[in-house]
């Protein structure tokens, strides 16, 4: 069994907009141009956790304390962030306008059938939507 998590579900907080804002402030670039930089950061974020952000952006943990809370439980293994999969599928999933529909791209990137993976999200509405689209999905709580 492979577990798929979306980025905000990993930290149980809307992390993506906060990270993009930090990147914009640090680089002076408009948000629109930061998508590739954020995508490039994902493997480190997955491997090292949110602490990597403090190293890159001193003061981030003070500005966004909820994104840096220690997890009460470990993640199930093996897990993949939906946006952290091999290009082009992972790249497309990151930019997909409908996050749940990006699960098909994630499964394609991993070469998995829907029954071989479980999507975990902290948002019950997205879990219900994923199930309605034929994916195995459960609510994940820290």
Q: Predicted regions span which residues?
A:
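N-terminal helical cap/lid subdomain that shapes the substrate entry/recognition surface
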Residues: 2-71
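Short glycine/serine/threonine/alanine-rich loop segments
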Residues: 29, 77, 112, 135
């Amino acid at each position: 069994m492979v577990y798929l998590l979306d980025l905000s579900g990993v930290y149980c907080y809307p992390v993506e907009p906060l990270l993009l804002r930090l990147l914009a402030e640090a680089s002076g670039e408009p948000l629109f141009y930061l998508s590739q930089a954020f995508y490039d950061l994902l493997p480190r974020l997955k491997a090292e956790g949110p602490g990597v952000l403090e190293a890159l952006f001193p003061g981030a943990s003070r500005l966004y304390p909820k994104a840096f809370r220690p997890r009460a439980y470990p993640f199930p293994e093996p897990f993949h962030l939906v946006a952290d999969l091999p290009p082009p599928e992972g790249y497309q999933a990151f930019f997909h306008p409908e996050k749940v529909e990006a699960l098909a791209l994630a499964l394609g990137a991993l070469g998995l059938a829907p029954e071989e993976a479980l999507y975990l999200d902290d948002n019950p509405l997205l879990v219900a939507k994923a199930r309605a689209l034929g994916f195995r999905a459960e609510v994940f709580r820290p």
